[in-house]
Amino acid sequence: MSYQITINNNTTSNVQNIVIADPNLASLGENVVFSDSQGPLSSLYVYDGVWVVKLRSPLSPGQSITITASSGTPNIDPTIALYYNNGSSYSNLTLVGSPTVSIVQDFGGYAISAYASGDFFLVASPTGFTPSSSRLLVVDRWATTPTSLDAVGLRLYADTNDWFGVVRKYINGAQNVSIEQKISGTYSVVNEIDISQFAAFTDPLVMYLSINGSTANVKVYKQGSNIGTVSGNYSTTPYGNPSMAGYGTVDKHYANFIVLPYEPDPQVTVTPISSPSPTPTPTPTPTPTPTYDITYVVFDVTPSPTPTPTLTSTPTPTPTPTYDITYVIFDVTPSPTPTPTPTPTPTPTPTPTSTTSSNI
């Protein structure tokens, strides 16, 4: 099974690293090879149906390219989502496709964050970069697993050299989420959002951070539904060591962030990912019912023979014979009454006469 994916760069920038999210790819599992006309491309598995694919060369504005996704041995490049390509800047990860799956993946302790510049998503390592983002979408792997711990955090780190702010999720008996922000080296609770509507925390939470001047707006989403917004100031003071060293074992867990595409790029388009069209099964042609051209009918008192159809079809039922009655003669002469034979009268038997004699 293979899928054809056509990418159209309708932007004004070059794009090379593409996030392809489509449930059709989930049927291929992790063993997916992406290829262009010259052969396999480098890729990075994110989650079922979601991959980061590095094009062989940047796709210029107005250009299109068709790649193929099929079962096979992938050409995994673990640096795609971690390091920049040209040594001076990070390549944009342009989201294409139809992201309908929740992306939750542990990258083995690597600290991965994402930010958007314009309509592009960027994935980078925490080795230091200057953010210019207004949007940030990440999700923590633990957010999908119920736990007995009091704090099972989700943090967004931010400053000019490292990350954008600090957000932490607390779970307590009241089922509240505490949004915390790193300000001047200390934590301060900006607001609390009641998430009692969440079902046992088995669904991932998405923290959406918007930077506007000195205000950080944090929105919490569950399956795309906004349940609240908090605001507060953020600090541009570098937070900790950009290499994440010394953060402690718990904070290393917090570094297991991945991209959760929420706002598809409206400018870079992709054709629907689909398999080749199957050959349609021909519909059998029905056998036509034979028709007859009747030019004349001869009526005779002899039953008509059954016509033999000229085409092979359902046999025509034998018609009931018809007769042409030409005339009927009625004889009005009464039939003679037969003369009855007279019954002979029986001759009566004579009564015998007795003679009496007397002797005096």
From Swiss-Prot:
Domain of life: Viruses
Spans annotated as 3 Thr-Pro repeats regions and two near identical repeats: 278-353
Ranges of the Thr-Pro(N) repeats in the UniProt entry: 270-291, 302-322, 333-353
Record has Repeat as a keyword: yes
Residue windows of the Sequence repeats: 292-301, 323-332
UniProt region (Disordered), positions on chain: 269-289, 332-360
Keywords carried by this UniProt record: Repeat
Record's compositionally biased regions (Pro residues): 275-289, 335-351
Protein name per the record: Viral protein TPX
Organism: Thermoproteus tenax virus 1 (strain KRA1) (TTV1)
